[in-house]
UniProtKB/Swiss-Prot annotation:
Family affiliation: Belongs to the RICTOR family.
Gene designation: RICTOR
Residues where Phosphothreonine is found: 1103, 1135, 1271, 1295, 1332, 1376, 1695
Ranges where the record places region Disordered: 1022-1041, 1103-1134, 1204-1252, 1275-1298
UniProt function note: Component of the mechanistic target of rapamycin complex 2 (mTORC2), which transduces signals from growth factors to pathways involved in proliferation, cytoskeletal organization, lipogenesis and anabolic output. In response to growth factors, mTORC2 phosphorylates and activates AGC protein kinase family members, including AKT (AKT1, AKT2 and AKT3), PKC (PRKCA, PRKCB and PRKCE) and SGK1. In contrast to mTORC1, mTORC2 is nutrient-insensitive. Within the mTORC2 complex, RICTOR probably acts as a molecular adapter. RICTOR is responsible for the FKBP12-rapamycin-insensitivity of mTORC2.
Residue ranges with Polar residues bias: 1206-1221
Residues reported in the UniProt entry to bind ATP: 543, 572, 576
Entry binding sites for Zn(2+): 1515, 1520, 1523, 1651
Region named Interaction with NBN: 1-789
Name the UniProt record assigns to this protein: Rapamycin-insensitive companion of mTOR
Localization per record: Cell membrane; Endoplasmic reticulum membrane; Lysosome membrane
């Protein structure tokens, strides 16, 4: 009703407005023949004189009435549509804006289909529509109607949309704000609408630039989002992506942040610059955030190369505080994090983002406890995927990959305090988020914070920076403590509920616990008396001065109560407290809620009631006194008028509301319940339920009582749920969610029943809330069983009710219940037919609500609501899917198999049709269905049989419709819900999160399935020296060394490999993939259960059959044996389990050596080792490092060795290896560490040099992970003309004590050095060989990438980048030894360095000793959260380059124009296209009027005769308002002279007749301050034009040339067109305008020329003019009569009515 009433009132207003404007009431007789009515209307509209404008207005309004009455039919109307349009368009030329508005309205009603629209456009009415939009003279009514007509044209057929109107809209969009045009937003909205329907015409005219410009102009998030989403929609699909310039247009929104000199408008005054900059920041922030909320935006801003995300993060490293502050706000918004207050105090900032901080919505008058609990208590879903997590994980991974963490460290250490504080909190939030939602391959390097640790520990950097870093680490520790503590309830009511729920569970668990207070000290009584005295209660009556801490202690004292202690002092103590708390005393009750000790006083009050309860009979009298007083207060409150009771009792503002907590405390105890019954408290509360306007009292009642026991408390709750007001019923329903989340005892027995009752509430909001709570409750199987037992009716609740019912199918009991009723078969059919598609809408709507300003329409309202209010970290839990529920058990799986559903879904995925949106939606529906099926092990087997998972992975990486990639990411997350799913994805280089939500601090499970005895293989770290070890936080007490061994195996395909040491000389062409994390294999690397076995086998192998000496000058290095060249072997690494070397001085190896074991070592150095068969022993000293380590330079004494051990493992593994891995974020120099994540070094087998350590030194801060797959034929790299180097495993253990490294701007990659002092090491030449190997790998990965692109990881400290020159054949070191040493000296000793994963196969998911959890002890039955990402996140950001679209595709009615303006031109705004450019080119070639008139007589004649010139270069019959009608009507108008369109009209008029001039007397030039007739100097306005700088008048001697001659008109036309085209340039605009005004003044009849106006309109439709210029041009022609067009209309109406013929061509 409201909507109807509103519509009627608006209509009345509209009518009244027209009457106010003077419209004459023209009667319309609908009983007459429609053709007669129409003829009368058209005659009145077309008549030039004799009909007042207001009468015309009446007739035009009658025209719309007539159309609405009889419909669209040429037969009924008696006129062709062309005839009607020829007459109606005259209304658009009327001088009265009301008539023009009515004409536009009439056209809008007339255009019903494409055929009519084609006719309107053929008659060039679009020129006149554009004219209405351009002109602004208090004519908003007219312009509004014009825009409504434009929208109708888009709706009818956007592909026909004319460029003339597009240019007009774009001009308003570009310049409207400066011109204070009120239609600017409407025009931009229409441009967006058009861009979606016909992107080509918008892109061709530069409309996309207009949209993006307005993004930076608009600070309203709803509008800003709509604008940017238009561009993102075009980027989403390959067919429309061509219209957006790659890497240029979308990146415009970043400009305010990335361009420090950005000025949005050159006209901004200096004084307004700061304000303008703030506005641009805000608008840009909104645009960036909206872009990151869409898949098209994410993929385009994150794609590898020079991406937008790199620009943003790079700017963080530049010390501009204003930009940093703004960017931090952007990042907080992108990750949906609350923004801390601006402060220099970290604690203050931290408290401002504490989830438990007070919020206004938690007040009693608002959402109270229900709102607080929804924020603080976690959702019951433990493993149901939250799609927001998937989205955030992807974004976070992309940002981390591009160096965000290092950027934040730079901001923390180099910014003002308030910025540093914000950056620290953001860093903490992101690390916490990464720990929770990132797969381990994406997060293993996050927790080290090496750069920050380095800065805090190093004395080589400025003190201020070091102190900042140290402070930041302390702050992060406090932040972690806050996260670990979790959100604490703010209100005592919620705290009371949670504590009671915990207490009941604990009591149940510890029912038979032994009393702890058996051994009470003898002096308890004495101590009690001392405390009584010190509490001050007995000393004085200043209640608030009492020691309330001591009072609480006394009341909680074990075994102290009035029953045990008869002491009078204790009774006095109790009486004083009782008096204080009684409502009648008005002491406690009248204190304000925000009083400093308010919470403490209430807590003590609750303890006091418990104390009295425990005192039994002795305390009963006091307790009864208190309770009766509270009842009296309650009755008094409820008896008053509501406003008085609240005002007088101060329920909203005073502690009186906490009396309900006292009642709640009593309701938790059986004795307390009896007391409440005895004092009629329950009866009083029941009476409250039926009273009106007692909402606050009822809220307090519901929130305070304990419902764990069956009794009157539940009766009261039940009554409030059914009998109270709507607001109270809704609150009570919401409170059931609080009880559910607080895990109140036996909720499934009684809570579910109450919720089912609420489903039938007449208020839809309440039933919907109950349904939502039931959905959450069913996450718990006990609740689901209880619900199925009740068999509720859910069909009346729409789609949500249906989805809840589908949950029944997930357990056999529910399946059989529904199957018996034939429900399952019906649903299968429905889902196949329509619900699979509906499911896509449901999910995308939820995601839109969570991510954008979109709000779901309420109660069937079609109006799309938007909200500027920012949602706090919303959740989008995956809706229930029929197939996903069926696959939870074997019966359901069998049913899906029998129905052949999966095969069809797989077919849709394998052969998608991406050209139609319906097909794209069908593909999404199939993906979601398959994902839900794959979310259980049963269903996953079905997907495996179809082998469809690789197809989904392919779509995720390569699909050209970018939103499909997003859907695939979500769907692959569903497949990763089970361990089996994770393992399958792992084989395809996708890593998944392997924990559920109940693990708040997830520990990485051990993936090593083959590990027989996990505990025995937990390695530990080698102690470097006492100083470094003691400085390590939480270091292991017992440190033992470990060793790394290379395992070679001639049997291909027998086990997984991790090849670090590669023979570079072998011929092979492995395939490389850039990875952001180690690649995980299905089966991990085999450890040996017994460390003794390993020790023996390794020691048995220490013979040296193939030693090869190499001097430091040997250019080729130690060549490997010919055997190693010819045989294809697989090299694997193994981390030896911990072996304690400290118990013996040395090892004595067993002398027998197995034949299959080889040791291949190449030595370099000046120490000679005999090439004998003896096996050197490894002594303890060989592995110990002295404290003077690093003082001598023995770089030549390095050695390389290869220990070769045979190992047999499982035979079904893929062959994978890691050739080069620099992917620790830590500075990787570590002690000889061996951890689950660590490959350790090859043992140095020399016995002579006791200071020799291991040769493994690779340092890096961020990751370039490279893995390659070995083919069975070969496993070595080929590298011509290169050293044969046995390479070191990057990041493996090290031997240097280190200081922290101070980094330069983190955006610059710095080397961490490969040199060290007196332990065996790679030479610098080896380092270059190593680097070259890396470069070649990168080139094979991305042949098209430049050196910097290929090598520069987003890391800030990448190994081997700019500091080493990367040239294939000429290695030049830019590092001096001293710089090597300096770099090494900085390295940090962060604990996590030792725990950073290296080995891809075995140790992917490992962290540290504390992370070692066997999969056996891990919660196996619990599903994971359902989140997976590719190991290399860039895999899903690759987009095929589509060239920018060509401008040759012009709408059909512009063919002639397209031919005319075919070339190129300069100086135009982008987006105008070739048409625009060439018109300049041609028009500049014309001779100016001055040149023609200055030429001699014969030249002028020749010029005119040779060109057959009309003065109009682009004129055709099709693009002229006048000539097109002649062509259509097929007759000539009466006034031939009016149209000088063809040369024949004046061809026979001799030149001398009007220019009586001899050859010897040329035209005289009369100087004036203007040049030419126009008064415009072409020398100034157009570079290169050949015009006179003098002024001319058309004179013969002193006689003016007659201006009514054809020749004169030609010249004037040329001059007008030349000046008009010059106006499209912003140079000398004023000069050109002056020239046109001069012509207007001297030759006004020049502009009364329809063909000239059509030509000008044609130029306006094909060239870009600024809005002021368009307005100026339109106003030149504004007072023109256009008589010939009236004559055409009269000719139409003069012809007798003829039978209309349907135009079939137009229809086609």
């Amino acid at each position: 009703m409201a909507a109807i009433g509103r519509g009627r009132s608006l209509k009345n207003l509209r009518v009244r407005g027209r009457n106010d404007s003077g419209e004459e009431n023209v009667p319309l007789d609908l009983t007459r023949e429609p053709s007669d009515n129409l003829r009368e209307i058209l005659q009145n509209v077309a008549r030039l004189q004799g009909v007042s404008n207001m009468r015309k207005l009446g007739h035009l309004n009658n025209f719309t009435k007539l159309l609405c009455d009889i419909g669209h039919s040429e037969e009924k109307l008696g006129f062709h549509y062309e005839d009607i349009i020829i007459c109606l368009r005259l209304a658009l030329l009327n001088e009265a804006k009301e008539v023009r508005a009515a004409g536009l309205r009439a056209l809008r009603y007339l255009i019903q289909d494409s055929s009519i629209l084609q006719k309107v456009l053929k008659l060039k009415v679009d020129y006149l529509i554009a004219r209405c939009i351009d002109i602004q003279q208090s004519n908003e009514v007219e312009r509004t109607q014009a825009l409504r007509l434009v929208r109708k044209m888009i709706t009818v057929n956007a592909s026909l949309f004319p460029s003339s109107v597009t240019n007009s809209l774009i001009a308003v969009g570009n310049d409207g704000l400066q011109e204070r045009d009120r239609m600017v937003r409407a025009c931009i909205a229409i441009i967006c609408e058009l861009a979606l329907q016909n992107p080509e015409v918008v892109a061709l005219r530069g409309g996309l630039n207009t949209i993006l410009k307005n993004v930076i102009d608009c600070q309203l998030s709803r509008i800003n989002e709509a604008l940017i989403t238009t561009i993102l929609h075009l980027l989403n699909h390959p067919k429309t992506r061509q219209y957006v310039r790659a890497d240029v247009e979308l990146e415009r929104i970043l400009a305010p942040y990335t361009d420090f000199h950005y000025r949005h408008s050159p006209d901004t005054a200096e004084g307004q610059l700061k304000e303008d900059r703030e506005a641009r920041f805000l608008a840009s922030k909104m645009g960036i955030i909206a872009t990151f909320r869409s898949w098209a935006g994410i993929i385009n801003l994150c794609k590898p190369g020079n991406s937008g995300i790199q620009s943003l993060i790079g700017v963080l490293c530049i010390p501009n505080m204003e930009i940093r502050r703004g960017l931090l706000e952007v990042l907080y918004d992108i990750f949906r994090l609350p923004l801390p207050v601006v402060t220099e105090e970290f604690i203050e900032a931290l408290l401002s983002v504490d989830p438990g901080r007070f919020q206004d919505s938690w007040r009693l008058s608002d959402g109270f406890v229900a709102a607080e609990a929804k924020t603080i208590l976690p959702h019951r879903a433990r493993s149901r995927p939250d799609l927001m997590d998937n989205y955030l994980a992807l974004i976070l991974s992309a940002f981390i990959r591009n160096g965000l963490l290092e950027g934040l460290v730079e901001v923390i250490t180099n910014s003002d305090d308030h910025i540093s504080v914000r950056a620290t909190i953001l860093l903490g939030e992101l690390l916490h988020m990464a720990n929770t939602i990132l797969p381990h391959s994406h997060s293993h390097h996050l927790h080290c914070l090496p750069t920050l640790m380095n800065m805090a520990a190093s004395f080589d950097i400025p003190k201020e920076k070091r102190l900042r870093a140290s402070a930041a680490l302390n702050c992060l520790k406090r932040f972690h403590e806050m996260k670990k503590r979790g959100p604490k309830p703010y209100s005592l009511h919620l705290d009371h509920i949670i504590q009671k729920a915990i207490a009941t569970h604990q009591k149940r668990d510890q029912y038979l616990r032994v009393q702890k207070d058996i051994f009470i000290l003898k002096d308890t009584e004495e101590a009690l008396l001392i405390n009584l005295r010190d509490s001050q209660v007995l000393q004085h009556k200043e209640n608030l001065e009492w020691n309330w801490n001591l009072i609480g202690t006394i009341l909680k004292w074990p075994n102290v109560n009035l029953r045990n202690y008869k002491d009078e002092q204790l009774h006095r103590f109790v009486r004083r407290l009782l008096y204080f708390y009684k409502p009648s005393s008005k002491l406690y009750a009248n204190l304000d809620l925000d009083f400093a000790k308010a919470k403490q006083l209430t807590v003590v009050g609750c303890q006091f009631t418990e104390f009295l309860l425990e005192s039994e009979e002795d305390g009963q009298g006091y307790l009864e006194d208190l309770v009766k007083d509270i009842v009296q207060w309650l009755n008094a409150s409820s008896g008053m008028k509501p406003e008085r009771s609240l005002q007088n009792n101060g329920l909203l503002t005073t502690l009186s509301q906490h009396y309900f907590l006292f009642i709640g405390t009593l309701s938790c105890h059986p004795h307390g319940v009896k007391m409440l019954e005895k004092c009629s408290v329950f009866q009083c509360l029941l009476n409250l339920c039926s009273l009106k306007n007692q909402d606050h009292l009822l809220k307090l009642t519901v929130s305070s009582l304990d419902y764990s026991r069956d009794g009157l408390a539940r009766v009261i709750l039940s009554k409030i749920l059914t009998a109270a007001t709507d607001a109270c019923r809704l609150y009570a329903t919401k409170h059931l969610r609080v009880l559910l989340r607080a895990n109140v005892e036996f909720f499934n027995n009684w809570g579910i029943e109450l919720l089912v009752t609420q489903l039938h509430d007449k208020n839809k909001t309440i039933s919907s809330e109950a349904l939502d709570i039931l959905d959450e409750a069913c996450e718990d199987k006990a609740n689901l069983h209880a619900l199925i037992q009740m068999k509720p009716a859910l069909s009346h609740l729409g789609d949500k009710g249906l989805l809840l019912l589908l949950r029944f199918l997930s357990i056999p009991k529910g399946f059989s219940y529904l199957n018996e009723r034939g429900y399952v078969a019906k649903q299968l059919e429905k889902w196949h037919r329509e619900y699979n598609s509906k499911y896509v809408d449901l999910i995308e709507e939820q995601l839109n609500e969570a991510l954008t300003t979109y709000r779901k329409p309420v109660d069937g309202d079609n109006y799309v609501r938007r909200s500027n209010q920012r949602l706090q970290r919303p959740h989008v839990y995956l809706p229930i899917h029929l197939y996903g529920q069926l696959v939870h058990h074997k019966t359901g799986c069998h049913l899906l198999e029998v129905q052949n559903i999966i095969t069809e879904l797989c077919r849709n995925v394998r052969t998608p049709d991406l050209d139609k949106w319906e097909e794209i939606k069908k593909l999404k529906a199939s993906l979601w269905a398959l994902g839900n099926i794959g979310s259980s092990n049963w269903g996953l087997n079905l997907l495996q049989e179809e082998n469809v998972i690789p197809d989904i992975l392919k779509l995720a990486k390569q699909c050209e419709v970018l939103s499909i990639r997003g859907t695939c990411v979500y769907v692959l997350g569903l497949i990763a819900k089970t361990k089996q799913g994770c393992d399958i994805l792992k084989c395809h280089n996708w890593d998944a999160v392997r924990h559920s939500r109940k693990h708040l601090w997830p520990v990485v499970p051990d993936d090593v399935e083959q590990l027989c005895n996990e505990l025995s293989s937990i390695p530990s770290t080698l102690s470097l020296n006492s100083e470094s070890t003691s400085s390590r936080h939480n270091s292991e007490s017992e440190s033992v060394p470990s060793s790394m061994f290379i395992l070679e195996d001639d049997r291909f395909g027998s086990s997984s490999t991790s090849t670090f040491f590669l023979d570079i000389n072998e011929d092979t062409e492995p395939t490389f993939y850039d990875r952001s994390g180690p690649i995980k294999d299905k089966n991990s690397f085999p450890f040996f259960a017994s460390s003794k076995l390993v020790k023996n086998r390794i020691l048995n192998s220490l013979t040296l059959p193939n030693k090869k000496h190499r001097s430091s000058s040997d250019p080729k290095g130690g060549k490997l044996s010919s055997e190693s060249k010819t045989s294809n072997r697989r090299i694997r690494t193994l981390t030896e389990p911990s072996v304690d070397f400290n118990h013996s001085d040395d090892f004595t190896p067993i002398s027998t050596v197995q034949k299959t074991l080889q040791l291949e070592t190449s030595f370099m150095g000046n120490k000679h080792i005999e090439d004998t068969g003896s096996t050197p022993s490894i002594g303890e000293n060989d592995l110990k490092f002295t404290k003077n380590f690093g003082t001598e330079n023995h770089r030549e004494n390095t050695s390389r060795e290869r220990l070769v051990v045979e190992s047999s493992t499982s035979s079904h593994m893929k062959i994978r290896s890691q050739s080069f891995n620099t992917d620790t974020t830590t500075s990787g120099i570590s002690s000889m560490s061996s951890s689950p994540s660590r490959e350790t070094v090859g043992v140095d087998a020399t016995t002579m040099d006791t200071d020799c350590g291991s040769m493994s030194t690779v340092v890096s801060t961020k990751t370039i992970k490279t893995s390659h797959y070995l083919t069975p034929q070969s496993n070595h790299l080929s590298l011509s003309k290169s050293n044969s180097v046995s390479l070191v495993p990057p990041g493996s253990s090290h031997t240097l004590p280190r200081r922290a490294q101070s980094l330069k701007a983190p955006s610059i990659a710095t080397i961490k050095s490969l040199a060290d002092c007196n332990f065996s090491y790679t030479s610098s030449r080896d380092a270059f060989g190593y680097a070259t190997l890396k470069r070649l790998q990168q080139q094979r990965m991305h042949p098209s990438l430049s050196h910097s692109e290929a090598l520069a990881s987003p890391a800030k400290d990448v190994l081997f980048t700019d500091t080493i020159t990367m040239k294939a054949n000429s290695f030049e070191s830019r590092l001096t030894p001293s710089r090597f040493m300096k770099a090494l000296s900085y390295a940090s000793l962060d604990k996590e360095d030792l725990l950073s994963p290296i080995n891809q196969n075995t140790l992917q998911r490992s962290s540290s000793v504390r992370s070692m959890v066997s999969s056996a002890t891990y919660g196996g039955s619990d599903d994971y959260i359902g989140l997976a990402l590719p190991v290399d996140i860039n895999d899903i950001f690759q987009v095929k380059d589509i060239p920018y679209f060509q401008t040759k595709n012009i709408p059909p009615h512009d063919d002639r124009g397209a031919r005319a303006f075919a070339h190129d031109a300069g100086g135009l705004p982008s987006g105008t296209g070739g048409l625009v450019k060439n018109s300049f080119h041609l028009l500049r070639q014309q001779m100016s009027l001055t040149e023609i008139m200055n030429s001699i007589h014969s030249d002028a004649s020749l010029f005119l005769e040779s060109t057959e010139d009309t003065g109009l270069q682009e004129h055709t019959d099709d693009n002229c308002l006048y000539c097109v009608c002649i062509e259509i009507l097929g007759f000539q108008p009466s006034n031939q002279l009016s149209a000088i369109c063809s040369h024949s009209d004046f061809q026979d008029i001799p030149y001398s007749d009007w220019c009586e001039q001899t050859i010897h007397n040329p035209l005289e030039v009369v100087p004036s301050k203007f040049s030419g007739i126009s008064g415009c100097s072409d020398g100034v306005s157009q570079e290169g034009s050949a015009s006179s700088t003098k002024s001319t008048e058309l004179l013969l001697g002193v006689k003016t040339i007659p201006d009514d001659t054809p020749m004169c008109r030609i010249l004037l036309r040329k001059e007008v067109l030349r000046l008009v085209i010059n106006l499209s340039s912003s140079v000398s605009t004023k000069c050109h305008e002056t020239g046109l005004l001069t012509i207007k003044e001297k030759y006004p009849q020049t502009f009364d020329d329809i063909c000239l106006y059509s030509e000008v309109s044609h130029l306006l439709s094909h060239c870009t003019f600024r809005l002021p210029c368009r307005r100026f041009i339109q106003e030149l022609f504004q007072d023109v009569q256009f008589l010939q067009m009236h004559e055409e209309a009269e000719a139409v109406l003069a012809t007798p009515p003829k039978q209309p013929i349907v135009d079939t061509s137009a229809e086609s």
